[in-house]
């Protein structure tokens, strides 16, 4: 028969033992029904089996004194491969009782089981065979398939809850021997199951009572700590109350002083406001007087405009009369048949005069267009006059047309003159008379035209006067605008003065508060000086006994000065602290001074 490889037989035996130990641990833990501790036998045997599995095929490391095999090296490698394992490595290194690498490895296995991550950690090791080859031989269990099978079996241990105390155990000196009797069935085991059930129930009751005892002890300790904290807070509150009473007395004095200062400031502000009101009223009166003068100027200008409008209405009436006269001239021109040439000369002269009138009207119109918005009414009147002149020009054009008709009639008349020469001779005397009358009418028209020229000159002079009045009004309006600007500037200066006044009031209030604080500090210093002058600081040599309890001082019973009265007391009679006027911080005070100062603070309270 062929001999088997002894290393393969060792691996198979270790695999079978691992299966039996893991299976027995899971079954017993589930039947046990509670968390496992370090004294549980199946759990101890499981760790022994795992230790043998990890030691199989481990390379020996030569040291100076001995030749050791340790499993801590590959387990320490897990930290680099699995970052979550850093906590286990750090906690194992921090354990004080462990001195050997084997003890650290055993503690590492127990912590990994409690975390339920032993299978994950060992799986990382098995995958990295190149790194494991530094620690294990090629035929080791961790390098072969049996190691992967054991890692798969370890996943079932996640069902178990274990609470192991690693600090108290002696993991360095334990002997790892596998107890095969646990895995061999006997008749006695069947009878002992009932005993184990009873023992488990008793252990459960024991654990329950221990947990209750722990909870009660924790509650009692927490209550003691609360009582101590409440006593300390009570003493602090009493001291703070005394300090608060002193502060309240000081604040009441400050309040009285501030009220008096506030009343003085109110009186000053009222006086200042009355003065400012009088100034504002005077400014308003001056503004009203200036406004009345401007209103009077405006009314005068309106009156002048009304007078000019009446004058222009009179001129329009005269123009209407002249238009009627021109109509009469048209009727007279029909009768002027023979003296057409002379009448043409006169008409040419009249045309020149009309062109001059038109040029004058155009100049007036241009000047009126250059005038400002305040002369719109005058522009409208001039436009009306221009319309009337246009009507006159149209009438003259009609006269020209009629003259052309008269020329035609003249030609016809020349033909008829030859026939009716005798009749004309008879009528010539009458016509000469009429011509003389027409000449007189022409003279009258020339005089009327001269009158119109003079009237237009007067209108131009009136326009210049109105322009002067407008310039004067503009100058006055500019003065009014400048006065308004000065008034606004004065208002801004008034507001700035008010702001400066308010800022000065705030500064005075702050100075008042600071002065009050300095006065209070000076009073406290004076009281402290008075207290120091009245007190006598007792020397250490002069005191041999406590003034209150009259116990003798020794090395254990030290001397303490009271900062208020200057006497020397023991620690028990001077275990009090209060703020004094001489020192803002709390200082040591004897019992009698402490009671006296608290009574004084309570009497000073309102």
UniProtKB/Swiss-Prot annotation:
InterPro entries: FYVE_RUFY2, RUFY1-3, Run_dom, Run_dom_sf, RUN_RUFY2, Znf_FYVE, Znf_FYVE-rel, Znf_FYVE_PHD
PROSITE patterns assigned: RUN, ZF_FYVE
Compartment list: Nucleus
GO MF: SH3 domain binding; zinc ion binding
Binding site for Zn(2+) 2: 562, 565, 590, 593
Residue ranges the record marks as coiled coil: 210-267, 294-515
Sequence ranges assigned to domain RUN in this UniProt record: 37-169
Alphabetic keyword roster: Coiled coil, Metal-binding, Nucleus, Zinc, Zinc-finger
Residue intervals of every FYVE-type zinc finger in the record: 540-598
Positions bound to Zn(2+) 1: 546, 549, 570, 573
GO CC field: cytoplasm; nucleus
Gene3D superfamilies, alphabetized: 1.20.5.170, 1.20.58.900, Zinc/RING finger domain, C3HC4 (zinc finger)
PANTHER family xrefs: RUN AND FYVE DOMAIN-CONTAINING PROTEIN 2 (PTHR45956:SF3), RUN AND FYVE DOMAIN-CONTAINING PROTEIN 2-LIKE PROTEIN (PTHR45956)
Subunit structure, interactors included: Interacts with BMX.
Protein name in the entry: RUN and FYVE domain-containing protein 2
Species assigned in the record: Mus musculus (Mouse)
Gene expressing this chain: Rufy2
């Amino acid at each position: 028969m062929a001999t088997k490889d002894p290393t393969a037989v060792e691996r198979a035996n270790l695999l079978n033992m691992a299966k039996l130990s893991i299976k027995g641990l899971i079954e017993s833990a589930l039947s046990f029904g509670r968390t496992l501790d370090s004294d549980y036998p199946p759990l101890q045997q499981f760790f022994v089996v795992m230790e043998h599995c990890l030691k199989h095929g481990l390379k020996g490391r030569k040291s100076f004194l001995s030749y050791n095999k340790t499993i801590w090296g590959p387990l320490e490698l897990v930290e680099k491969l699995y970052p979550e394992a850093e906590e286990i490595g750090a906690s194992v290194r921090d354990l004080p009782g462990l001195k050997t690498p084997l003890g650290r490895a055993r503690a590492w296995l127990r912590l990994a089981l409690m975390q339920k991550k032993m299978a994950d950690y060992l799986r990382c090791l098995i995958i990295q065979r190149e790194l494991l080859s530094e620690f294990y031989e090629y035929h080791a269990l961790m390098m072969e398939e049996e190691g992967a099978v054991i890692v798969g079996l370890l996943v079932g241990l996640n069902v178990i809850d274990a609470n192991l105390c690693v600090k108290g155990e002696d993991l360095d000196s334990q002997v790892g021997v596998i107890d095969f009797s646990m895995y061999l069935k006997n008749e006695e085991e069947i009878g002992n199951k009932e005993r184990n059930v009873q023992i488990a129930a008793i252990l459960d009751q024991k654990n329950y009572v221990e947990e209750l005892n722990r909870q009660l002890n924790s509650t009692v300790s927490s209550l003691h700590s609360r009582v101590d904290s409440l006593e300390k807070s009570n003493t602090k509150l009493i001291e703070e109350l005394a300090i608060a009473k002193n502060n309240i007395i000081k604040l009441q004095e400050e309040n009285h002083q501030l009220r008096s200062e506030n009343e003085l400031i109110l009186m000053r502000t009222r006086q200042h406001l009355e003065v400012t009101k009088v100034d504002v009223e005077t400014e308003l009166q001056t503004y009203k007087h200036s406004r009345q003068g401007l209103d009077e100027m405006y009314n005068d200008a309106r009156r002048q405009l009304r007078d000019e409008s009446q004058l222009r209405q009179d001129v329009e009436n005269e123009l209407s009369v002249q238009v009627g006269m021109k109509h009469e001239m048209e009727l007279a021109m029909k009768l002027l048949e023979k003296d057409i040439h002379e009448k043409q000369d006169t008409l040419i002269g009249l045309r020149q005069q009309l062109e001059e009138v038109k040029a004058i009207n155009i100049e007036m119109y241009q000047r009126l267009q250059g005038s400002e918005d305040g002369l719109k009414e005058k522009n409208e009147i001039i436009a009306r006059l221009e319309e009337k002149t246009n009507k006159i020009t149209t009438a003259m054009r009609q006269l020209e047309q009629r003259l052309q008709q008269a020329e035609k009639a003249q030609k016809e008349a020349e033909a008829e003159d030859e026939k009716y020469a005798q009749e004309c001779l008879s009528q010539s005397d009458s016509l000469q008379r009429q011509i003389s009358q027409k000449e007189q009418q022409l003279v009258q028209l020339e005089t009327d035209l001269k009158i119109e020229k003079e009237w237009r000159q007067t209108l131009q002079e009136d326009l210049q006067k109105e322009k002067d009045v407008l310039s004067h009004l503009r100058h006055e309006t500019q003065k009014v605008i400048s006065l308004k600007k000065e008034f606004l500037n004065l208002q801004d200066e008034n507001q700035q003065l008010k702001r400066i006044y308010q800022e000065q009031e705030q500064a005075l209030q702050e100075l008042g508060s600071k002065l009050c604080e300095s006065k209070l500090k000076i009073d406290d210093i004076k009281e402290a000086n008075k207290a120091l002058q009245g007190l006598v600081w007792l020397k250490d040599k002069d005191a041999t006994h406590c003034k209150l309890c009259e116990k003798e001082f020794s090395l254990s019973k030290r001397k303490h000065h009271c900062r208020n009265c200057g006497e020397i007391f023991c620690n028990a009679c001077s275990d009090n602290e209060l703020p004094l006027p001489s020192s803002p911080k709390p200082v040591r005070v004897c019992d009698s001074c402490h009671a006296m100062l608290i009574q004084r603070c309570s009497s000073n309270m309102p």
